[in-house]
Design a protein with these regions (language model features):
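Short hydrophobic beta-strand element within catalytic cores of glycosyltransferases
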Residues: 297, 306-309
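Conserved acidic donor-binding segment of nucleotide-sugar-dependent glycosyltransferases
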Residues: 321, 325-332, 341-346
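Conserved donor-binding/catalytic core segment of Leloir-type glycosyltransferases
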Residues: 7, 193-209, 215-218, 231
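Short His-centered aromatic/hydrophobic patch
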Residues: 95-100, 120
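N-terminal strand-loop element at the rim of the active site
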Residues: 8-15, 23, 27-74
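Short alpha-helical donor nucleotide-sugar binding micro-motif in glycosyltransferases
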Residues: 139, 268-269, 276-281
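Aromatic "clamp/platform" in nucleotide-sugar-dependent glycosyltransferases that forms part
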Residues: 289
Length: 387
């Protein structure tokens, strides 16, 4: 077996989906014997809150302008400046996002590297002309595009006329498990989780997480279950959703949903505490309107939680109606009814039993092997073009 030197690039050290994908893929490739180094923009100087057995290199990121176009431009240049000085040479340069892909495209243009791979987790609908150009360039200039779901594979083909082979996401069963480790009670006390039932979602407050409709649905649930609690964890994001957040909190005030009592907002949860947090909940609710895949859904299932999620791709690519309660993300009433149903013992028990079978299919080892197949093809193609 040929062993490769692989550079994986990600735009952040915060635990967003594509960042976790990068880190878990790196670990899996490392375990298969390949040398992997993760390059990540580190805007707060804190690095990863993640234990890694493979190398990583933190790319210094300075305070950026408020204007999003200028911010993205600066982040791309920070990557370019840092990578231009590297002495290390890799067989594969693999970007997991628009920012790092644009940086690699510049390095190809400057003839510092010969090619790069880009994983497209999803396509954004940018209102900014500059951001749309960045996204287009990150896709069109890549020598190989990969994607993580059938729905985005079709959309990439439709919008860009590019075939992006599909690779899978995975879930780390060494981290996410229904087996308690004795720290659940202390975390519940720390966060003020004394109610019942406890609903959890991960991803923060933002439009595509459908946070406002989830809050409206939770308001209905509180009428029947006044001691219920909704935990919205996470929230690290590159974009400013302040207007949406203001609307969210105004709604909470109108519905008299008290923060710290019924609504728990722990923010970004540490890598060590996240698996424990899943185990404190009674159900996982994720009525997202747009996802590349939905890693947190797999994490919740691995943690033994019954799941409510949207009745649309990509969720319907790996979940059936017997494995999760699939609801219209546009219907507050449907979300609320599912939240009432999912805590019924016969419903939750069946969902948990039926959903466990998907975990063996979605492993990071399987994902790494799929990546290696495409890496090998790409390396062969580049060598053929050179010689």
């Amino acid at each position: 077996m040929t062993l490769y030197r692989i550079a994986l690039l990600t735009y952040s050290t915060e635990p967003r989906g594509s960042v976790i994908h990068t880190l878990e893929l790196a670990e899996a490739l490392h375990k298969l014997g390949h040398y992997v180094c993760v390059y990540a923009l580190d805007k707060d100087g804190k690095g990863f809150d993640y234990t890694s057995s493979c190398d990583y290199d933190l790319v210094p990121a300075q305070a950026a302008p408020i204007d999003i176009d200028q911010l993205i431009q600066q982040r791309i240049q920070e990557f370019v400046s840092y990578l231009s000085q590297l002495q290390s040479v890799y067989d594969v340069y693999h970007a997991q996002d628009c920012i790092s892909a644009n940086a690699l495209a510049k390095l190809v243009q400057q003839q510092q590297i010969s090619s790069f791979v880009r994983t497209i987790h999803h396509i954004e609908d940018y209102s900014s002309h500059y951001l749309q150009q960045c996204q287009d360039r990150s896709i069109r200039n890549a020598n190989l595009c990969l994607c993580v779901s059938d729905c985005w594979q079709k959309e990439i083909q439709r919008q860009y006329r590019i075939h992006a082979p599909r690779v899978i996401n995975g879930v780390n069963l060494e981290r996410f498990s229904p087996i308690a480790n004795g720290l659940e009670s202390s975390l519940k006390e720390q966060l003020g989780l004394s109610g019942s039932p406890i609903y959890l979602t991960v991803g923060g407050i933002e439009p595509r997480k459908n946070s406002i409709r989830l809050l409206q649905a939770f308001g209905q649930v509180l009428e029947d279950y006044p001691t219920a609690q909704l935990v919205i964890a996470g929230g690290a994001t590159l974009f400013d959703y302040q207007t949406y957040r203001d609307d969210f909190f105004a709604l909470a005030d109108r519905l008299d949903i008290q923060i710290g009592r019924s609504l728990i907002l722990p923010g970004v949860v540490s890598d060590a505490e996240l698996p424990i947090l899943y185990r404190t909940a009674d159900a996982f609710v994720f009525p997202s309107t747009k996802e590349g895949w939905g890693l947190v859904v797999l994490e919740a299932i691995a943690s033994g939680l019954p799941v409510i999620t949207s009745n649309q791709p990509p969720f319907t690519e790996f979940l059936s109606e017997t494995q999760a309660l699939l609801v219209s993300p546009d219907s507050t009433d449907a979300i609320a009814q599912a939240m009432r149903s999912v805590i019924q013992p016969n419903v939750s028990r069946l969902l948990m039993q039926q959903s466990q079978s998907i975990l063996s299919r979605y492993t990071w080892e399987n994902s790494a092997k799929m990546h290696l197949h495409y890496y090998q093809n790409q390396i062969t193609n580049i060598k053929t073009e050179l010689y």
